[in-house]
């Protein structure tokens, strides 16, 4: 087998005009740098005390929720790397810069959940909380790695759209951000777990930047070729039933009344509203000049608006 070495021809940072700091990926990169936070700075002492005050069923519910969160963060940390290679193949160095930060933040989210779990004593094997959930298995064990790893062999626009819909719009937008919002609302309404409240607030802020990049990437490809809008819709239609299965699944021995009295209908409405508005932003890119998409701040502004709306809702919790 003969291997052909690939040599570097030039440097993006040395080209005339330098880097385009007005492009959305580099704006997100700058915003992420300005909002840096360290998981080790968060105090979980009160959380460990509050944990002891939860009922056995409440602790099991929290353990399941956190297991799904941390395993998801670990999975996306591992699976994101093919997208970086796809951006390199396109010559999009600004996207590469942002995705390095993106991946670092996912690893940091894994760290902070593990620190919290260690602090409250969740140190046993927790695989049953994810492995027995058929929706979770389908998305995180199969669909996520499949869609991202497809970029290794074929980083085509259609495959990038499928990967972004899977990663950004289903895993992050439909599952993670909805779950984080619900969990923070529960903690605030009961006045418990202040460390976890800070964790979720900071992670949510990071994830909204990730979502902005995912929406931007889909918009870029839809603007270049309207047939990619069909790819967006097909992938969403394929994955959403799996997401619903994950959310609705409960262990066979779970009590009839959901711990914390979580309103599933309210969560479904929240997720549907956010997904619909993000998909609307992608659809709106049809017919827009591609060069205009690169500096269009609308995906970033949409996520900022979601942050404002979440903060207002949590104030009422």
Swiss-Prot record:
Protein residues bound to Fe cation: 106, 172, 207, 210
Pfam families assigned: Ribonuc_red_sm
Essential cofactor(s): Fe cation; Mn(2+)
Signal peptide residue numbers: none
Domain of life from the UniProt record: Bacteria
One term of GO molecular function: metal ion binding
Enzyme Commission designation: 1.-.-.-
Keywords: Iron, Manganese, Metal-binding, Oxidoreductase
Residues that, per the record, bind Mn(2+): 73, 106, 109
Single GO biological process annotation from the record: deoxyribonucleotide biosynthetic process
Function: Probable oxidase.
Subunit structure: Homodimer.
Homology family: Belongs to the ribonucleoside diphosphate reductase small chain family. R2-like ligand binding oxidase subfamily.
The protein's name: R2-like ligand binding oxidase
Organism of provenance: Saccharopolyspora erythraea (strain ATCC 11635 / DSM 40517 / JCM 4748 / NBRC 13426 / NCIMB 8594 / NRRL 2338)
């Amino acid at each position: 087998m003969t291997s052909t070495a690939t040599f570097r021809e030039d440097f993006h940072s040395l080209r005339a005009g330098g880097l385009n700091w007005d492009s959305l990926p580099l704006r997100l990169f700058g915003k992420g740098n300005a909002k840096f936070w360290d998981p080790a700075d968060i105090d979980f002492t009160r959380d460990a005390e509050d944990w002891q005050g939860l009922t056995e069923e409440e602790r099991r519910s929290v353990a399941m929720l956190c297991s799904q969160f941390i395993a998801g963060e670990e999975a996306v940390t591992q699976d994101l790397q093919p997208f970086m290679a796809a951006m390199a193949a396109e010559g999009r160095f600004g996207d590469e810069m942002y995705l390095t930060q993106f991946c670092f933040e996912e690893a940091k989210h894994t760290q902070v959940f593990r620190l919290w779990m260690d602090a409250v004593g969740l140190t046993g094997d927790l695989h049953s909380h994810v492995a027995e959930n058929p929706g979770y298995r389908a998305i995180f064990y199969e669909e996520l790695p499949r869609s991202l790893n497809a970029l290794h062999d074929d980083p085509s626009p259609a495959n990038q759209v499928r990967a972004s819909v899977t990663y950004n719009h289903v895993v992050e937008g439909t599952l993670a951000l909805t779950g984080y919002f619900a969990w923070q609302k529960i903690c605030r309404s009961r006045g418990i777990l202040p460390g976890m409240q800070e964790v979720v607030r900071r992670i949510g802020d990071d994830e909204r930047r990730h979502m902005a990049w995912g929406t931007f990437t889909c918009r870029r490809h839809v603007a270049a070729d309207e047939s990619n809008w069909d790819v967006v819709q097909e992938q969403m239609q394929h994955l959403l039933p799996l997401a619903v299965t994950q959310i609705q699944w409960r262990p066979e021995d779970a009590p009839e009344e959901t711990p914390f009295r979580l309103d599933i209908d309210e969560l479904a409405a929240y997720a549907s509203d956010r997904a619909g508005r993000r998909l609307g932003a992608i659809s709106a890119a049809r017919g827009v000049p591609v060069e205009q998409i690169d500096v269009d701040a609308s995906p970033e502004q949409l996520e900022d608006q979601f942050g404002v709306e979440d903060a207002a809702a949590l104030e009422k919790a």
